[in-house]
């Protein structure tokens, strides 16, 4: 096993499947890199002053650079820290996430664009895990060029009650469709649909619906997302509802 300095959240798996990085839960600042054979001690590095990790990262296709979601809390924006594995995970740059509260990011098919779940929630480490902008939060799903940081596309819920759905986790099919899961920051008894499907360039979110009783049982909270290689099924965990749900994304119906 590998000891961590504190509570972790997510992992980034190296493309060769021999190495990984565990990242701190927000507002933690540590990340620990380790080999999966367990023969060498882990290497812990930290986010710079003025930043903290958001629990998720991904390697570039070549496996040299690690891209980690961070909170630039004094400037109230999300960013992506760039860390060089070849130089002991030295931080060598950053990209904008084009939103607030960047959480999970994934590398899209083709290996050149990130999909980023900007949860829309402003936090500051001096306030612990307090959510500071629930009245004005504006989550989005952003597609960002890995090389330049340019925003290629984005989609968000319309103004109003749906803006309280914080986009947190996501996964992409090989054809580029993205499934994402939300956590409701409003009245969870409203029973809003928590899982969406987006086709880049479409400009719209397609709901992956469930029967009302099932939706209510999720208590406004969905977690991780996974998709099958065949391009049909999406799985979403619901920790507060003690279940995992499966959707057929062609029919957009729960299986």
Outline where the language-model segments fall.
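Residue-level detector of Asp-centered blade-edge/turn motifs that repeat once per structural unit
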Residues: 15-17, 60-62, 108-111, 173-175, ...
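Surface loop/turn motifs at the tips and blade-to-blade linkers of beta-strand repeat domains
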Residues: 2-6, 45-50, 94-99, 155-162, ...
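Short, conserved, GDST-rich strand-edge loop motifs in beta-rich repeat architectures
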Residues: 69-72, 116-138, 180-193
């Amino acid at each position: 096993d590998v000891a961590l300095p504190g509570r972790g959240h997510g992992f980034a798996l190296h493309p060769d499947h021999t190495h990984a990085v565990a990242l701190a839960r927000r507002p933690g600042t540590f990340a620990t890199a380790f080999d999966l054979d367990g023969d060498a001690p882990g290497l812990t590095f930290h986010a710079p002053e003025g930043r903290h990790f958001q629990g998720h990262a991904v390697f570039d296709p070549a496996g040299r650079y690690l891209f980690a979601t961070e909170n630039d809390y004094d400037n109230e924006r999300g960013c992506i820290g760039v860390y060089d594995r070849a130089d002991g995970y030295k931080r060598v740059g950053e990209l904008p996430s084009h939103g607030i509260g960047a959480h999970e990011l994934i590398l899209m098919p083709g290996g050149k664009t990130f999909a980023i779940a900007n949860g829309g929630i402003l936090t500051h480490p001096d306030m612990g895990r307090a959510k500071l902008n629930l009245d004005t939060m504006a989550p989005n799903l952003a597609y960002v060029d890995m090389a330049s940081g340019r925003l290629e596309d984005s989609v968000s819920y319309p103004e109003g009650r749906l803006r309280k759905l914080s986009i947190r986790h996501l996964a992409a099919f090989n054809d580029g469709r993205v499934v994402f899961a939300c956590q409701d920051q409003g009245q969870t008894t409203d029973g809003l649909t928590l899982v969406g499907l987006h086709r880049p360039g479409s400009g719209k979110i397609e709901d992956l619906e469930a029967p009302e009783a099932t939706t209510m049982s999720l208590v406004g909270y969905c977690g991780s997302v996974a998709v099958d290689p065949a391009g049909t099924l999406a799985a979403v965990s619901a920790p507060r509802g003690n279940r995992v749900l499966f959707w057929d994304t062609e029919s957009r119906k729960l299986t």
